């Protein structure tokens, strides 16, 4: 049996190809993909500007789907048939960064769609402990945004943002917008900086109080 997958063969060359149906290991789950986001790093892979990507590569790390087969180590609140989002950062759990909770800095980190094949294919396997259940009130097509949201929240947490503070955020792309809107939930005041006026106007429509065009 075969499934379709999105490959970047080399910079500037993308195609849909048939690949073998994945067979999971005991500690993996099998997931039927139903939505995937296109990240800036995917665009970088296509353009050849992402130095971490090797080719050919199945892209995709902002991915949601339905659990087809369960695996050992799966969170207790998840079962076959549930909608899940994957954590694309596969860490070893044994190195020093992992031992202090900085799994994103794992010395042996593998990011799906970057270092190893990703999830822009009809059916994928993924480590069973690295999936999260999607709340019933979140549409599948919106759920992939949870991954870039975690990037924005991580930045706010690392900066130790507190209520009443002003927060300068450089870049009004998806993650910058999420950081600005999240800062408001922390009762902080975001100042969003970009050189694309259209992005800044859109940010204002979303409720970002202060924007600055750095090209002015």
Where are these regions (language model features)?
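Residue-level recognition of beta-strand termini and adjacent short loop/turns
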Residues: 10-12, 25
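Glycine-rich beta-strand-centered segment in the early N-terminal region that forms part
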Residues: 20-36, 49-96, 135-137
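Short glycine/threonine/proline-enriched tight-turn/helix- or strand-capping micro-motif at secondary-structure
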Residues: 13-20
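Cytochrome P450 core scaffold surrounding the K-helix E-X-X-R motif
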Residues: 41-46
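Mid-domain Rossmann-like dinucleotide-binding core that forms the NAD(H)/NADP(H) cofactor-binding site
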Residues: 138-216
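NAD(P)H dinucleotide-binding glycine-rich loop of Rossmann-like/cofactor-binding domains
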Residues: 92-170
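Extreme N-terminal starter segment of soluble prokaryotic enzymes
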Residues: 2-4
């Amino acid at each position: 049996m075969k499934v379709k997958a999105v490959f970047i063969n080399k910079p500037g060359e993308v195609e849909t190809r048939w690949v073998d149906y994945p067979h999971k290991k005991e500690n993996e789950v099998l997931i039927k993909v139903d939505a995937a986001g296109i990240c800036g790093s995917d665009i970088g892979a296509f353009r050849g500007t992402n130095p971490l990507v090797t080719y050919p590569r199945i892209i995709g790390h902002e991915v949601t789907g339905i659990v087809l087969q369960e695996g050992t180590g799966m969170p207790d609140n998840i079962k076959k048939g549930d909608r899940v989002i994957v954590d694309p950062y596969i860490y070893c759990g044994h190195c020093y960064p992992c031992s202090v909770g900085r799994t994103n800095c794992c010395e042996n980190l593998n990011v799906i769609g970057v270092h190893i094949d990703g999830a822009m294919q009809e059916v994928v396997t993924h480590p069973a402990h690295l999936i999260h259940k999607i709340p019933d009130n979140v549409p599948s097509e919106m759920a992939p945004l949870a991954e870039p949201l975690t990037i924005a929240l991580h930045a706010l947490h690392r900066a130790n943002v507190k209520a009443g503070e002003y927060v300068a955020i450089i870049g009004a792309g998806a993650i910058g917008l999420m950081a600005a809107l999240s800062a408001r939930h922390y009762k902080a005041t975001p100042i969003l900086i970009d050189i694309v006026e259209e992005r800044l106007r859109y940010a204002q429509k979303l409720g970002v109080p202060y924007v600055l065009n750095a090209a002015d």
